[in-house]
Amino acid sequence: MVVLSQPALNQFFLLKPFKSTPLFTGIPVVDLTHPDAKNLIVNACRDFGFFKLVNHGVPLELMANLENEALRFFKKSQSEKDRAGPPDPFGYGSKRIGPNGDVGWVEYLLLNTNPDVISPKSLCIFRENPHHFRAVVENYITAVKNMCYAVLELMAEGLGIRQRNTLSRLLKDEKSDSCFRLNHYPPCPEVQALNRNLVGFGEHTDPQIISVLRSNSTSGLQICLTDGTWVSVPPDQTSFFINVGDALQVMTNGRFKSVKHRVLADTTKSRLSMIYFGGPALSENIAPLPSVMLKGEECLYKEFTWCEYKKAAYTSRLADNRLAPFQKSAAD
């Protein structure tokens, strides 16, 4: 990604001037080893749709190794990086977010979590030593998946679901439609003189069941609270941040809310984030779980397959309410 002139910057969404948002100190923190972790998770998902996870069991070495490999790729020349794209949907992409006109000050690698798919993509990403990149990615994803299973099983317990694996089995399914994304937000000093904030990734919710984010020490992530206030999330490169996705909102019949979030680019420092998106198989039916609903409680959402929802999501803009077409009305 190159230095931008003022006219070039105009194609990106520049937020209006506002006082810098202080880092929000009220982010829920869940210790995965805490005796009451199941209830802490449920409370955080209900009140915020988001929480910070500590004592997660993923070795810091795996995080550092992947960060180093990602930065090694993003520091390549643009022509070299372009050989790993365009995204189909997997591969390298820059500035364009999806097919419907959304843009951001970001470049990324999007990968399937299936090792058989990672392998051929690795040849395009690092031609000189693809096997090392593949091993680093697979080691990280395996560790994060296992951690994610534990979170979902505690979540099921906290919701009073009798079978602990009700949620985790969807991600353990060999046909699980999960993916992994490396986002790089280069510094953009040209924006500083404009008294604007450059959006790296515009406001949106994640469509999957759950997403697991880890970033370097550069801030930029913001979440929207239930009252509509945007707050900045303090970075912590040793911890993970867990997002409730649209599918989980439906499965809990609205008890959990998929959190709206965005990323603002920094003027002087680059931000690198790595996100695991845990999704079900394409054929999986998504609907409110009877085991979480009270007697006589009405379903807020129509049943749909993950494939149907995914197709609908790809026809929408980033900030759209993608669940709206699947919400039940009084006439249903």
UniProtKB/Swiss-Prot annotation:
<comment type="function">
    <text>Catalyzes the 2-beta-hydroxylation of several biologically active gibberellins, leading to the homeostatic regulation of their endogenous level. Catabolism of gibberellins (GAs) plays a central role in plant development. Converts GA9/GA20 to GA51/GA29 and GA4/GA1 to GA34/GA8.</text>
</comment>
<feature type="binding site">
    <location>
        <position position="206"/>
    </location>
    <ligand>
        <name>Fe cation</name>
    </ligand>
</feature>
<dbReference type="GO" id="GO:0045543">
    <property type="term" value="F:gibberellin 2-beta-dioxygenase activity"/>
</dbReference>
<dbReference type="Pfam" id="PF03171">
    <property type="entry name" value="2OG-FeII_Oxy"/>
</dbReference>
<keyword id="KW-0560">Oxidoreductase</keyword>
<feature type="binding site">
    <location>
        <position position="204"/>
    </location>
    <ligand>
        <name>Fe cation</name>
    </ligand>
</feature>
<dbReference type="InterPro" id="IPR044861">
    <property type="entry name" value="IPNS-like_FE2OG_OXY"/>
</dbReference>
<dbReference type="GO" id="GO:0046872">
    <property type="term" value="F:metal ion binding"/>
</dbReference>
<keyword id="KW-0479">Metal-binding</keyword>
<dbReference type="InterPro" id="IPR026992">
    <property type="entry name" value="DIOX_N"/>
</dbReference>
<dbReference type="InterPro" id="IPR050231">
    <property type="entry name" value="Iron_ascorbate_oxido_reductase"/>
</dbReference>
<feature type="active site">
    <location>
        <position position="271"/>
    </location>
</feature>
<protein>
    <recommendedName>
        <fullName>Gibberellin 2-beta-dioxygenase</fullName>
        <ecNumber>1.14.11.13</ecNumber>
    </recommendedName>
</protein>
<dbReference type="Pfam" id="PF14226">
    <property type="entry name" value="DIOX_N"/>
</dbReference>
<dbReference type="InterPro" id="IPR027443">
    <property type="entry name" value="IPNS-like_sf"/>
</dbReference>
<dbReference type="GO" id="GO:0009686">
    <property type="term" value="P:gibberellin biosynthetic process"/>
</dbReference>
<keyword id="KW-0408">Iron</keyword>
<comment type="pathway">
    <text>Plant hormone biosynthesis; gibberellin biosynthesis.</text>
</comment>
<feature type="domain" description="Fe2OG dioxygenase">
    <location>
        <begin position="175"/>
        <end position="280"/>
    </location>
</feature>
<keyword id="KW-0223">Dioxygenase</keyword>
<feature type="binding site">
    <location>
        <position position="261"/>
    </location>
    <ligand>
        <name>Fe cation</name>
    </ligand>
</feature>
<dbReference type="InterPro" id="IPR005123">
    <property type="entry name" value="Oxoglu/Fe-dep_dioxygenase_dom"/>
</dbReference>
<comment type="similarity">
    <text>Belongs to the iron/ascorbate-dependent oxidoreductase family. GA2OX subfamily.</text>
</comment>
